[in-house]
Amino acid sequence: MDVEQEDAIKGWKIRRLIEYLEKAKGNGTSLISLIIPPKEQISLINQKLTDAHGRAQNIKSKAVQKAVQDAIISTKQKLSVIKQIPPNGLILYCGKFIGEDEKTEKQILEVLEPLRAINTTFFLCENTFYTQPLRDMLQEQDKFGFIIMDGNGSLFGTLQGNAREILHKFDVDLPKKHGRGGQSALRFARLRLEKRHNYMKKVAEVAINCFIQNDRVNVLGIVLAGAAEFKNELAANEYLDQRIRAKVVTIIDVNYGGENGFNQAIELSQVQLQNVKFIKEKNLITKLFEEVAQNSITVCYGLTDTMKALEMGAVETLVIWENLEFIWFKLKNPVTKEESTVVLSPQQATEKNHFQDEANQCELNIVERFALTEWLIDNYKNYGARLEFVTDRSQEGSQFVKGFGGICGFLRYEVNFEKMEFQEEEGYLDPDEDFL
Protein backbone atom coordinates (compact mmCIF):
# COMPACT_ATOMS: atom_id res chain seq x y z
CA MET A 1 0.00 0.00 0.00
CA ASP A 2 1.48 3.41 -0.93
CA VAL A 3 1.77 6.26 1.58
CA GLU A 4 -1.04 8.31 0.03
CA GLN A 5 -3.49 5.39 0.18
CA GLU A 6 -2.46 4.52 3.72
CA ASP A 7 -2.99 8.13 4.87
CA ALA A 8 -6.41 8.29 3.16
CA ILE A 9 -7.54 5.14 4.98
CA LYS A 10 -6.19 6.38 8.32
CA GLY A 11 -8.01 9.66 7.73
CA TRP A 12 -11.30 7.88 7.07
CA LYS A 13 -10.95 5.79 10.23
CA ILE A 14 -10.20 8.88 12.32
CA ARG A 15 -13.23 10.73 10.91
CA ARG A 16 -15.48 7.77 11.73
CA LEU A 17 -14.02 7.58 15.25
CA ILE A 18 -14.62 11.31 15.80
CA GLU A 19 -18.27 10.93 14.73
CA TYR A 20 -18.72 7.97 17.09
CA LEU A 21 -17.03 9.64 20.06
CA GLU A 22 -18.87 12.94 19.68
CA LYS A 23 -22.25 11.19 19.82
CA ALA A 24 -21.38 9.67 23.21
CA LYS A 25 -22.82 11.31 26.31
CA GLY A 26 -21.62 9.90 29.61
CA ASN A 27 -23.15 9.69 33.05
CA GLY A 28 -21.64 12.67 34.88
CA THR A 29 -17.87 12.80 34.34
CA SER A 30 -17.48 9.14 33.39
CA LEU A 31 -15.82 9.51 29.96
CA ILE A 32 -12.02 9.48 30.01
CA SER A 33 -9.83 11.20 27.42
CA LEU A 34 -6.13 10.46 27.94
CA ILE A 35 -3.20 11.73 25.84
CA ILE A 36 0.30 10.43 26.58
CA PRO A 37 3.48 11.75 24.87
CA PRO A 38 6.08 9.20 23.66
CA LYS A 39 8.65 9.63 26.46
CA GLU A 40 6.17 9.68 29.35
CA GLN A 41 6.50 6.91 31.93
CA ILE A 42 3.44 4.69 32.25
CA SER A 43 4.00 4.51 36.02
CA LEU A 44 3.43 8.29 36.30
CA ILE A 45 0.21 8.03 34.30
CA ASN A 46 -0.96 5.17 36.51
CA GLN A 47 -0.33 7.31 39.58
CA LYS A 48 -2.50 10.10 38.12
CA LEU A 49 -5.26 7.57 37.48
CA THR A 50 -4.97 6.20 41.02
CA ASP A 51 -5.27 9.73 42.42
CA ALA A 52 -8.32 10.38 40.22
CA HIS A 53 -9.88 7.12 41.42
CA GLY A 54 -9.48 8.32 45.01
CA ARG A 55 -10.98 11.73 44.30
CA ALA A 56 -13.99 10.04 42.69
CA GLN A 57 -14.98 8.86 46.19
CA ASN A 58 -16.22 12.42 46.79
CA ILE A 59 -18.82 12.24 44.01
CA LYS A 60 -22.25 12.37 45.66
CA SER A 61 -24.13 10.26 43.12
CA LYS A 62 -23.23 6.59 43.67
CA ALA A 63 -24.12 5.76 40.05
CA VAL A 64 -21.81 8.46 38.67
CA GLN A 65 -19.09 7.52 41.16
CA LYS A 66 -19.20 3.89 40.03
CA ALA A 67 -19.18 4.87 36.33
CA VAL A 68 -16.12 7.11 36.81
CA GLN A 69 -14.20 4.56 38.88
CA ASP A 70 -15.04 1.73 36.46
CA ALA A 71 -13.68 3.81 33.56
CA ILE A 72 -10.48 4.57 35.49
CA ILE A 73 -10.00 0.88 36.35
CA SER A 74 -10.53 -0.15 32.70
CA THR A 75 -8.01 2.48 31.59
CA LYS A 76 -5.41 1.23 34.09
CA GLN A 77 -5.98 -2.38 32.99
CA LYS A 78 -5.42 -1.39 29.37
CA LEU A 79 -2.22 0.48 30.20
CA SER A 80 -0.95 -2.52 32.18
CA VAL A 81 -0.57 -4.56 28.98
CA ILE A 82 1.28 -1.77 27.15
CA LYS A 83 5.01 -2.23 27.74
CA GLN A 84 6.13 1.04 26.17
CA ILE A 85 4.49 4.18 24.79
CA PRO A 86 4.71 4.12 20.95
CA PRO A 87 7.09 6.55 19.15
CA ASN A 88 4.30 9.07 18.46
CA GLY A 89 2.61 8.74 21.85
CA LEU A 90 -0.80 7.31 22.72
CA ILE A 91 -4.42 8.52 22.75
CA LEU A 92 -6.97 6.57 24.81
CA TYR A 93 -10.74 6.96 25.17
CA CYS A 94 -12.67 4.94 27.74
CA GLY A 95 -16.10 4.96 29.37
CA LYS A 96 -19.72 3.87 29.30
CA PHE A 97 -22.47 5.87 27.64
CA ILE A 98 -26.09 5.56 26.57
CA GLY A 99 -26.64 4.62 22.91
CA GLU A 100 -28.70 6.56 20.39
CA ASP A 101 -31.82 4.62 21.38
CA GLU A 102 -31.41 6.20 24.85
CA LYS A 103 -31.83 2.75 26.42
CA THR A 104 -28.82 0.60 25.62
CA GLU A 105 -25.62 1.20 27.60
CA LYS A 106 -22.45 0.92 25.52
CA GLN A 107 -18.81 0.82 26.50
CA ILE A 108 -15.89 2.13 24.51
CA LEU A 109 -12.17 1.51 24.98
CA GLU A 110 -10.30 2.94 22.01
CA VAL A 111 -6.50 3.19 21.85
CA LEU A 112 -4.59 4.65 18.94
CA GLU A 113 -1.16 6.01 18.10
CA PRO A 114 -1.20 9.57 16.69
CA LEU A 115 -0.05 10.08 13.09
CA ARG A 116 2.71 12.34 14.41
CA ALA A 117 4.47 12.74 17.74
CA ILE A 118 2.63 14.66 20.47
CA ASN A 119 4.41 16.52 23.26
CA THR A 120 1.76 17.17 25.91
CA THR A 121 0.10 15.05 28.59
CA PHE A 122 -3.66 15.47 28.88
CA PHE A 123 -6.16 13.74 31.18
CA LEU A 124 -9.85 14.63 31.34
CA CYS A 125 -12.91 13.04 32.95
CA GLU A 126 -16.05 14.63 31.51
CA ASN A 127 -19.48 13.76 30.14
CA THR A 128 -18.09 14.05 26.58
CA PHE A 129 -14.86 12.89 24.93
CA TYR A 130 -12.17 15.43 24.03
CA THR A 131 -11.73 14.92 20.26
CA GLN A 132 -9.75 18.03 19.28
CA PRO A 133 -6.44 16.07 19.01
CA LEU A 134 -8.08 13.80 16.42
CA ARG A 135 -9.34 16.81 14.45
CA ASP A 136 -5.84 18.29 14.55
CA MET A 137 -4.53 15.02 13.12
CA LEU A 138 -6.82 15.33 10.09
CA GLN A 139 -5.77 18.91 9.44
CA GLU A 140 -2.10 17.96 9.62
CA GLN A 141 -2.36 14.76 7.61
CA ASP A 142 -1.33 15.92 4.12
CA LYS A 143 2.42 16.02 3.54
CA PHE A 144 4.08 18.13 0.84
CA GLY A 145 7.64 18.06 -0.46
CA PHE A 146 9.82 21.11 -1.16
CA ILE A 147 12.95 21.47 -3.28
CA ILE A 148 14.70 24.83 -2.79
CA MET A 149 17.63 25.46 -5.14
CA ASP A 150 19.85 28.32 -6.19
CA GLY A 151 23.43 28.81 -7.33
CA ASN A 152 24.80 28.05 -3.86
CA GLY A 153 23.06 24.75 -3.12
CA SER A 154 19.80 22.87 -2.59
CA LEU A 155 17.52 21.99 0.30
CA PHE A 156 14.93 19.19 0.43
CA GLY A 157 12.16 19.30 3.01
CA THR A 158 8.57 18.43 3.87
CA LEU A 159 5.64 20.31 5.35
CA GLN A 160 2.91 18.49 7.26
CA GLY A 161 0.39 20.73 8.97
CA ASN A 162 2.55 23.27 10.80
CA ALA A 163 5.52 20.90 11.12
CA ARG A 164 8.35 21.35 8.66
CA GLU A 165 11.28 18.97 8.34
CA ILE A 166 14.57 19.35 6.48
CA LEU A 167 15.41 16.00 4.88
CA HIS A 168 18.70 16.90 3.17
CA LYS A 169 20.74 19.87 2.02
CA PHE A 170 24.05 20.38 0.26
CA ASP A 171 26.16 23.25 -1.02
CA VAL A 172 27.55 23.67 -4.51
CA ASP A 173 30.35 25.81 -5.93
CA LEU A 174 29.31 26.85 -9.42
CA PRO A 175 31.67 29.08 -11.41
CA LYS A 176 30.36 32.54 -12.25
CA LYS A 177 30.05 33.80 -15.80
CA HIS A 178 33.43 34.60 -17.41
CA GLY A 179 33.79 38.09 -18.88
CA ARG A 180 36.95 37.59 -20.96
CA GLY A 181 37.12 36.37 -24.56
CA GLY A 182 39.32 33.89 -26.40
CA GLN A 183 39.88 30.15 -26.01
CA SER A 184 39.93 30.33 -22.23
CA ALA A 185 36.40 31.78 -22.25
CA LEU A 186 35.14 28.86 -24.35
CA ARG A 187 36.79 26.34 -22.04
CA PHE A 188 35.38 28.14 -19.03
CA ALA A 189 31.88 28.17 -20.55
CA ARG A 190 32.08 24.41 -21.20
CA LEU A 191 33.28 23.82 -17.63
CA ARG A 192 30.50 26.01 -16.26
CA LEU A 193 27.83 24.15 -18.26
CA GLU A 194 29.25 20.79 -17.19
CA LYS A 195 29.16 21.72 -13.49
CA ARG A 196 25.64 23.11 -13.85
CA HIS A 197 24.59 19.89 -15.59
CA ASN A 198 26.11 17.76 -12.80
CA TYR A 199 24.38 19.94 -10.21
CA MET A 200 20.98 19.33 -11.83
CA LYS A 201 21.69 15.62 -11.99
CA LYS A 202 22.60 15.48 -8.29
CA VAL A 203 19.45 17.40 -7.30
CA ALA A 204 17.32 14.94 -9.30
CA GLU A 205 19.06 11.96 -7.65
CA VAL A 206 18.63 13.33 -4.11
CA ALA A 207 14.96 14.07 -4.88
CA ILE A 208 14.43 10.35 -5.55
CA ASN A 209 16.02 9.43 -2.21
CA CYS A 210 13.85 11.96 -0.36
CA PHE A 211 10.48 11.58 -2.08
CA ILE A 212 10.28 8.05 -3.54
CA GLN A 213 9.40 5.22 -1.17
CA ASN A 214 8.41 1.70 -2.25
CA ASP A 215 8.43 2.88 -5.89
CA ARG A 216 5.87 5.63 -5.17
CA VAL A 217 6.03 9.31 -4.31
CA ASN A 218 5.57 9.65 -0.55
CA VAL A 219 4.07 13.18 -0.56
CA LEU A 220 0.81 14.60 -1.87
CA GLY A 221 2.51 17.28 -3.95
CA ILE A 222 5.91 18.91 -4.53
CA VAL A 223 6.86 22.59 -4.64
CA LEU A 224 9.90 23.70 -6.66
CA ALA A 225 11.30 27.01 -5.45
CA GLY A 226 14.41 29.10 -5.85
CA ALA A 227 16.05 32.13 -7.34
CA ALA A 228 16.92 32.59 -11.03
CA GLU A 229 16.17 29.79 -13.50
CA PHE A 230 17.43 26.78 -11.55
CA LYS A 231 13.97 25.56 -10.48
CA ASN A 232 12.58 25.86 -14.02
CA GLU A 233 15.57 24.01 -15.45
CA LEU A 234 15.03 21.24 -12.91
CA ALA A 235 11.35 20.92 -13.85
CA ALA A 236 12.31 20.41 -17.50
CA ASN A 237 15.46 18.35 -16.86
CA GLU A 238 15.47 14.81 -18.22
CA TYR A 239 17.05 13.49 -15.03
CA LEU A 240 14.08 14.48 -12.86
CA ASP A 241 12.08 11.32 -12.18
CA GLN A 242 8.74 11.31 -14.04
CA ARG A 243 6.90 10.33 -10.85
CA ILE A 244 8.26 13.39 -9.07
CA ARG A 245 7.59 15.69 -12.04
CA ALA A 246 3.95 14.53 -12.06
CA LYS A 247 3.59 15.63 -8.42
CA VAL A 248 4.89 19.19 -8.94
CA VAL A 249 2.00 21.48 -7.94
CA THR A 250 3.69 24.86 -8.32
CA ILE A 251 7.00 26.52 -9.20
CA ILE A 252 7.65 29.73 -7.30
CA ASP A 253 10.30 32.45 -7.01
CA VAL A 254 11.90 33.06 -3.63
CA ASN A 255 14.51 35.61 -2.66
CA TYR A 256 16.71 33.24 -0.70
CA GLY A 257 18.17 29.77 -0.74
CA GLY A 258 18.47 27.32 2.15
CA GLU A 259 16.21 27.49 5.20
CA ASN A 260 15.13 31.08 4.62
CA GLY A 261 14.04 30.12 1.11
CA PHE A 262 12.21 27.08 2.53
CA ASN A 263 10.25 29.29 4.93
CA GLN A 264 9.39 31.76 2.17
CA ALA A 265 8.32 28.96 -0.19
CA ILE A 266 5.97 27.57 2.49
CA GLU A 267 4.40 30.99 2.92
CA LEU A 268 3.98 31.67 -0.81
CA SER A 269 2.57 28.24 -1.72
CA GLN A 270 -0.30 28.01 0.81
CA VAL A 271 -3.13 28.65 -1.68
CA GLN A 272 -1.85 26.07 -4.18
CA LEU A 273 -1.36 23.44 -1.47
CA GLN A 274 -4.89 23.91 -0.13
CA ASN A 275 -6.28 23.23 -3.62
CA VAL A 276 -4.23 20.09 -4.34
CA LYS A 277 -6.66 17.60 -2.80
CA PHE A 278 -9.68 19.04 -4.60
CA ILE A 279 -7.78 19.19 -7.90
CA LYS A 280 -6.94 15.50 -7.60
CA GLU A 281 -10.57 14.70 -6.74
CA LYS A 282 -11.84 16.82 -9.64
CA ASN A 283 -9.49 15.13 -12.12
CA LEU A 284 -10.48 11.65 -10.94
CA ILE A 285 -14.23 12.27 -11.21
CA THR A 286 -13.93 14.24 -14.46
CA LYS A 287 -12.18 11.19 -15.93
CA LEU A 288 -15.20 9.08 -14.90
CA PHE A 289 -17.63 11.57 -16.48
CA GLU A 290 -15.64 11.54 -19.74
CA GLU A 291 -15.57 7.73 -19.89
CA VAL A 292 -19.32 7.52 -19.22
CA ALA A 293 -20.04 10.14 -21.91
CA GLN A 294 -18.15 7.96 -24.41
CA ASN A 295 -20.15 4.87 -23.37
CA SER A 296 -16.89 3.27 -22.29
CA ILE A 297 -17.05 -0.21 -20.81
CA THR A 298 -13.77 0.26 -18.94
CA VAL A 299 -15.60 2.03 -16.09
CA CYS A 300 -18.52 1.00 -13.91
CA TYR A 301 -20.59 2.90 -11.39
CA GLY A 302 -23.38 2.26 -8.92
CA LEU A 303 -23.35 -0.35 -6.19
CA THR A 304 -24.41 -3.47 -8.13
CA ASP A 305 -22.07 -3.21 -11.13
CA THR A 306 -19.10 -2.00 -9.10
CA MET A 307 -19.35 -4.83 -6.57
CA LYS A 308 -19.69 -7.37 -9.39
CA ALA A 309 -16.61 -6.01 -11.12
CA LEU A 310 -14.66 -5.96 -7.85
CA GLU A 311 -15.47 -9.61 -7.10
CA MET A 312 -14.34 -10.49 -10.64
CA GLY A 313 -10.98 -8.83 -10.01
CA ALA A 314 -11.69 -6.43 -12.86
CA VAL A 315 -11.42 -3.20 -10.84
CA GLU A 316 -8.05 -1.47 -11.03
CA THR A 317 -9.06 1.65 -9.06
CA LEU A 318 -12.07 1.71 -6.74
CA VAL A 319 -13.46 5.18 -5.99
CA ILE A 320 -15.88 5.68 -3.10
CA TRP A 321 -17.52 8.61 -1.34
CA GLU A 322 -16.07 8.96 2.16
CA ASN A 323 -19.57 8.91 3.71
CA LEU A 324 -20.93 5.93 1.78
CA GLU A 325 -23.81 4.55 3.86
CA PHE A 326 -24.30 0.99 2.55
CA ILE A 327 -24.01 -1.99 4.91
CA TRP A 328 -22.36 -5.32 4.06
CA PHE A 329 -23.90 -8.51 5.51
CA LYS A 330 -22.81 -12.13 5.57
CA LEU A 331 -25.92 -14.31 5.99
CA LYS A 332 -26.39 -18.01 6.76
CA ASN A 333 -29.40 -20.10 5.89
CA PRO A 334 -30.28 -22.23 8.98
CA VAL A 335 -31.93 -24.88 6.79
CA THR A 336 -29.48 -25.31 3.90
CA LYS A 337 -26.41 -24.08 5.89
CA GLU A 338 -25.44 -22.02 2.84
CA GLU A 339 -23.75 -18.64 3.34
CA SER A 340 -24.31 -15.59 1.17
CA THR A 341 -23.44 -11.90 1.17
CA VAL A 342 -25.62 -8.88 0.48
CA VAL A 343 -25.09 -5.12 0.52
CA LEU A 344 -28.06 -3.01 1.64
CA SER A 345 -28.91 0.62 2.25
CA PRO A 346 -29.72 1.60 5.87
CA GLN A 347 -33.42 1.62 4.93
CA GLN A 348 -33.24 -1.84 3.31
CA ALA A 349 -31.42 -3.15 6.39
CA THR A 350 -34.61 -2.50 8.41
CA GLU A 351 -36.81 -4.50 5.99
CA LYS A 352 -37.28 -8.16 6.98
CA ASN A 353 -37.79 -9.45 3.43
CA HIS A 354 -34.04 -9.07 2.75
CA PHE A 355 -33.31 -11.59 5.51
CA GLN A 356 -35.84 -14.29 4.60
CA ASP A 357 -35.72 -17.40 2.44
CA GLU A 358 -39.24 -17.87 1.09
CA ALA A 359 -38.48 -21.27 -0.45
CA ASN A 360 -37.51 -22.78 2.90
CA GLN A 361 -39.73 -20.46 4.93
CA CYS A 362 -36.95 -19.44 7.30
CA GLU A 363 -35.20 -16.32 8.50
CA LEU A 364 -31.54 -15.92 7.52
CA ASN A 365 -29.04 -15.51 10.35
CA ILE A 366 -26.67 -12.52 10.30
CA VAL A 367 -23.14 -13.90 10.64
CA GLU A 368 -21.27 -10.62 10.07
CA ARG A 369 -22.24 -6.99 9.59
CA PHE A 370 -19.95 -4.12 8.53
CA ALA A 371 -20.26 -0.65 7.10
CA LEU A 372 -19.47 -1.25 3.41
CA THR A 373 -16.59 1.24 3.49
CA GLU A 374 -15.08 -0.65 6.42
CA TRP A 375 -15.40 -3.95 4.54
CA LEU A 376 -13.85 -2.45 1.40
CA ILE A 377 -10.90 -1.06 3.39
CA ASP A 378 -10.22 -4.53 4.81
CA ASN A 379 -10.71 -6.41 1.54
CA TYR A 380 -9.98 -4.25 -1.54
CA LYS A 381 -6.37 -5.49 -1.78
CA ASN A 382 -7.62 -9.09 -2.01
CA TYR A 383 -9.15 -8.16 -5.38
CA GLY A 384 -6.04 -6.38 -6.70
CA ALA A 385 -7.57 -2.90 -6.57
CA ARG A 386 -6.43 0.54 -5.44
CA LEU A 387 -8.76 2.55 -3.21
CA GLU A 388 -9.47 6.27 -3.58
CA PHE A 389 -11.75 8.40 -1.38
CA VAL A 390 -13.62 11.47 -2.61
CA THR A 391 -15.73 14.06 -0.79
CA ASP A 392 -18.94 15.79 -1.83
CA ARG A 393 -17.48 19.23 -1.11
CA SER A 394 -16.57 19.95 -4.74
CA GLN A 395 -19.12 20.33 -7.54
CA GLU A 396 -17.80 17.18 -9.22
CA GLY A 397 -17.85 15.23 -5.94
CA SER A 398 -21.43 16.25 -5.23
CA GLN A 399 -22.49 15.15 -8.72
CA PHE A 400 -20.66 11.83 -8.26
CA VAL A 401 -22.60 11.13 -5.05
CA LYS A 402 -26.01 12.19 -6.36
CA GLY A 403 -25.78 10.83 -9.90
CA PHE A 404 -23.51 7.79 -9.58
CA GLY A 405 -24.29 6.46 -6.11
CA GLY A 406 -20.95 7.49 -4.62
CA ILE A 407 -19.12 4.39 -5.88
CA CYS A 408 -17.38 3.54 -9.16
CA GLY A 409 -14.54 1.50 -10.57
CA PHE A 410 -11.96 2.05 -13.29
CA LEU A 411 -11.52 -1.37 -14.88
CA ARG A 412 -8.36 -3.15 -15.99
CA TYR A 413 -10.29 -4.80 -18.84
CA GLU A 414 -13.66 -4.34 -20.53
CA VAL A 415 -16.73 -5.80 -18.84
CA ASN A 416 -20.11 -6.01 -20.56
CA PHE A 417 -22.58 -5.71 -17.69
CA GLU A 418 -25.66 -5.84 -19.95
CA LYS A 419 -24.56 -9.21 -21.30
CA MET A 420 -23.83 -10.46 -17.78
CA GLU A 421 -27.29 -9.38 -16.61
CA PHE A 422 -28.92 -11.20 -19.52
CA GLN A 423 -26.94 -14.38 -18.84
CA GLU A 424 -27.85 -14.25 -15.15
CA GLU A 425 -31.54 -13.94 -16.04
CA GLU A 426 -31.25 -16.89 -18.43
CA GLY A 427 -29.37 -18.94 -15.84
CA TYR A 428 -26.10 -19.10 -17.78
CA LEU A 429 -23.93 -17.88 -14.92
CA ASP A 430 -23.06 -19.90 -11.87
CA PRO A 431 -22.97 -17.43 -8.96
CA ASP A 432 -20.39 -19.62 -7.23
CA GLU A 433 -17.93 -18.97 -10.06
CA ASP A 434 -17.45 -15.27 -9.25
CA PHE A 435 -19.14 -14.15 -12.47
CA LEU A 436 -16.51 -15.82 -14.66
Swiss-Prot record:
Location(s), subcellular: Cytoplasm
GO cellular component terms, A-Z: cytoplasm
GO molecular function, one term: translation release factor activity
SUPFAM superfamilies registered for this protein in UniProt: L30e-like, N-terminal domain of eukaryotic peptide chain release factor subunit 1, ERF1, Translational machinery components
Record bears the keyword Ribonucleoprotein: no
InterPro entries: eFR1_2_sf (IPR042226), eRF1_1_Pelota (IPR005140), eRF1_1_sf (IPR024049), eRF1_2 (IPR005141), eRF1_3 (IPR005142), Peptide_chain-rel_eRF1/aRF1 (IPR004403), Ribosomal_eL30-like_sf (IPR029064)
NCBIfam families: aRF1_eRF1
Protein name: Eukaryotic peptide chain release factor subunit 1
